[in-house]
Amino acid sequence: MAISMTGFGRGEYKDDNYYFLVECKTINHKYSDINIRLPRKISFLEDKVRNLVKNYVKRGRVDLYIKFDLLGKEDVNLNFDEGLASQYIDILKEIKNKFDIIDDISVMNVAKFPDIVKIEEKEEDEDLLWSMLNQAVEDALIKLREMRSEEGKKLAEDIAMRCDLLKNHIEEIEKYSSSVVEDYREKLNLRISELLDDPSIIDENRLAQEVAIYADKSSITEEIVRFKSHIGQLKNTIFKDDSIGRKIDFLIQEMNRETNTIGSKSSDINITNLVVEVKSELEKIREQIQNIE
């Protein structure tokens, strides 16, 4: 079944210590374009997230946002450099004695010096974090796929309906085309009769030859056969479980080409009007497939 490139999905994971929120939005795009925003603290998981997204989205622009919070636990360690602190204290004592400073040396005096107190982020277990984030991302992607599939189903049904309209139009064109040559013969015969004083001298062989040449030039049988084949392929394609947008686009291009040829070969007003209708329906399908994966 056709899959829309437009959709949204949201997933969460939460326990006593960790919270993940994942939001994923997709829109139409000619190729696959995956954009991931996640906190620096878990940036090492980006490639795994990207690979997971690729399993669900074959084409389109993907914007995936990840929020990560630690609950009930500190995410940093505070340490101090004992050796460096000892050196600072010794030098402060030396300064105090040398200049007879009466103030005492306090903890605050020492702590203000660079690199005495160090803030270090705690290292989290990568496998543990991924097992939790994977659940949230997959939950969001499953919901995204459901929404895209539902929208794709509606698009496929609309295209199938338009395929039926196209089939009706091309069958009408085929019906009118069968009488085009005979109409040409009658008009040619009438025109010659008007120009000649004696219609009985019309060269029937030459007339038949001219009609045959016209019939060959104006024949749209091959175009109609190919057009019908493309309609069948299009209807079969839109209900396949695959990335089908580009194939449908190709079929529409081919159908437009056949339609243009039919229009250029025929001067029949009925066929001309039907060609306009066919091109209108093809344009509507072309607009629809811009949003199919």
From Swiss-Prot:
Keyword Nuclease in record: yes
GO MF term set: RNA endonuclease activity
InterPro entries in alphabetical order: YicC-like_C, YicC-like_N, YicC/YloC-like
Keywords of this entry: Endonuclease, Hydrolase, Nuclease, Sporulation
Source species, domain of life: Bacteria
EC number(s) from the headed UniProt entry: 3.1.26.-
Similarity comment: Belongs to the YicC/YloC family.
Protein name: Probable endoribonuclease YicC
